[in-house]
């Protein structure tokens, strides 16, 4: 019904009331026909203001964000209704035969509706097959006041959900799904909420199932969920060379890849919060695969991830991994490094860090073939099948222990103590160990009598070390270096020969007589 007709009917209704043609119920309340009420309600709904904060729900709690529930949004039925900057909300589901190109500063509320790309070329570049394309210097903000709207492809896995081409993308709410990659970011992308889930990247030349961070661009994650995505590398997030990923909070969970189930980093990854959990890799890096560059972890947790070969929690092929906070726990690798597998370069952990509850065949907590500096922190409660329940150091590599390094209560096999396992020709460097430091030691070389195995290459206090095997003990050598040696054997004391004597021509033995005694008769000897 048009607004003009509605006004005419409203006028007739008022006239009927005044003329007494429409009877009033007791109390003076007029009951109009249901059809008229319905039309009036629809008209009122069409004219009602759509107001809410840009975060969609008013629940966002992040530094720098101030809620404004009075923001007014303009309803649209198609993207052709967007003529410039502004706040817009969907009044219905929208289907696109080609990508929508954002050229303005647009805040879009899905309002519980869907945006579906229906027509695409599987052989085209992901930018061409995107649902939404953010142009250079444009800004697109995605939110959803009803929290169940979605951006997707009708035919799964054929293009990006959102392609950011040197623009600005902010995600507060809503879902991006059923794409080859949820978000390809060649600009700046801040994620505060919402979900990127169920995307599968089958293209061999493109990595990243959830988010792909391109060269010289940044993805900052303050909240939200990246889950159930799949790719060859970086099931959750792939960071390309010279790209950068900063994770402050949020969840990366249930993603799968050949390498880097949760995150694959080729340049820079800073993690100060959030949780990377329950991701899986077919080969290396169930939680995180660090190909090169820098992985700096100052907080958050990497837990419950699985690798079919190396690095259940973290696999570092090269580059530097610095762990100054956070926890790596309950991860599993089929062969090496349940918590961390450090292949090359340096892995450093310090006070306030924990590696615990991880499992692998070798190196339940850490498997190291590079350089490992333990400046503090705790490696405990890890388990291996073969060797290195806490830490496995292969032959010819370096480990440094400083400050409050703790490697205790790790086991191998059937609950046998096995904490720091030193391969052949490996010595430990120590510096300024404190009273809280405690390191259990097992060596590949077996100590022999008068031939101990050297543990430290420099002078160190033996009180910070203990032997995992009770058959050995910790000692020091001529230059005060710590060694693992056989326990000193106690001197063998022969059983005493009992005194014998003859009494009444009968021989007696084992009778204690003391130093001074007298035999009354017969033959005797003292």
Question: Where is each model-derived feature located?
Answer:
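Extracellular beta-strand-rich solenoid/capping regions of secreted or surface-exposed proteins
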Residues: 95-107, 117-144, 153-169, 180-187, ...
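Solvent-exposed beta-strand/loop surfaces, strongest in extracytoplasmic domains of secreted
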Residues: 486-526
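Extracellular/surface-exposed low-complexity segments
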Residues: 30-82, 402-491, 514-521
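C-terminal segment of classical bacterial N-terminal signal peptides
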Residues: 18-31
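Well-ordered beta-strand segments characteristic of repetitive beta-sheet solenoids
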Residues: 88-90, 106-110, 132, 140-144, ...
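Glycine-rich repeat segments that build the extracellular carbohydrate-interaction surface of secreted
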Residues: 74, 81-96, 106-113
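Sec-dependent N-terminal signal peptides
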Residues: 3-18
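Beta-strand-rich solenoid/repeat architectures in extracellular/passenger domains
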Residues: 112-128, 143-159, 172-180, 194-207, ...
């Amino acid at each position: 019904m048009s607004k003009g007709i509605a006004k005419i009917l409203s006028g007739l209704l008022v006239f009927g009331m005044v003329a007494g043609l429409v009877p009033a119920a007791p109390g003076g309340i007029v009951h109009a026909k249901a059809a008229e009420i319905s039309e009036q309600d629809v008209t009122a709904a069409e004219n009602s203001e759509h107001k809410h904060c840009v975060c969609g729900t008013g629940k966002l709690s992040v530094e720098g964000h101030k809620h404004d529930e009075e923001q007014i949004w303009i309803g649209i039925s198609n993207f052709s209704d967007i003529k410039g900057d502004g706040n817009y909300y969907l009044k219905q589901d929208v289907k696109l035969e080609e990508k929508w190109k954002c050229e303005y500063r647009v805040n879009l509320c899905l309002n519980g509706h869907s945006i579906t790309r229906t027509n695409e070329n599987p052989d085209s570049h992901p930018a061409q097959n995107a649902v939404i394309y953010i142009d250079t210097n444009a800004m697109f903000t995605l939110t959803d006041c009803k929290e169940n709207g979605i951006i997707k492809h009708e035919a799964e896995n054929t293009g990006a959900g959102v392609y950011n081409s040197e623009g600005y993308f902010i995600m507060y709410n809503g879902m991006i799904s059923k794409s080859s990659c949820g978000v390809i970011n060649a600009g700046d992308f801040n994620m505060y909420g919402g979900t990127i889930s169920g995307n599968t990247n089958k293209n061999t030349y493109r990595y990243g199932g959830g988010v792909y961070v391109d060269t010289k661009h940044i993805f900052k994650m303050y909240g939200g969920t990246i889950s159930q995505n799949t790719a060859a590398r970086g099931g959750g997030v792939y960071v390309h060379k010279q790209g950068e990923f900063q994770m402050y909070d949020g969840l990366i969970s249930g993603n799968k890849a050949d390498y880097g189930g949760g995150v694959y980093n080729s340049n820079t990854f800073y993690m100060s919060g959030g949780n990377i959990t329950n991701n899986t890799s077919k080969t290396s890096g169930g939680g995180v695969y660090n190909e090169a560059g820098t992985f700096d972890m100052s907080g958050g947790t990497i837990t419950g991830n699985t690798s079919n070969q190396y690095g259940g929690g973290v696999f570092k092929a090269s580059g530097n991994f610095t762990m100054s906070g956070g926890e790596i726990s309950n991860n599993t690798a089929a062969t090496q490094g349940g918590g961390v597998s450090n292949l090359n370069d340096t892995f450093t952990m310090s006070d306030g860090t924990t590696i615990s509850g991880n499992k692998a065949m070798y190196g339940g907590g850490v498997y190291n073939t590079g350089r490992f500096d333990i400046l503090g922190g705790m490696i405990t409660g890890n388990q291996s099948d073969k060797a290195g329940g806490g830490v496995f150091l292969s032959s010819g590599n370096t480990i440094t222990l400083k400050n409050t390094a703790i490697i205790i209560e790790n086991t191998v096999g059937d609950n046998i103590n096995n904490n720091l396992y030193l391969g052949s020709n490996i010595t430990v460097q120590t510096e300024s160990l404190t009273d809280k430091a405690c390191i259990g030691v097992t060596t590949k070389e077996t100590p022999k009598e008068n031939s101990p195995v050297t543990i430290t290459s420099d002078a160190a206090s033996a009180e910070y070390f203990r032997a995992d095997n009770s058959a050995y003990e910790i000692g020091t050598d001529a230059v005060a270096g710590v060694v693992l040696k056989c326990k000193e054997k106690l001197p063998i004391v022969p059983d005493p020969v009992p005194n014998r004597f003859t009494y009444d021509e009968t021989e007696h033995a084992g009778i204690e007589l003391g130093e001074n005694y007298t035999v009354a008769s017969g033959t005797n000897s003292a």
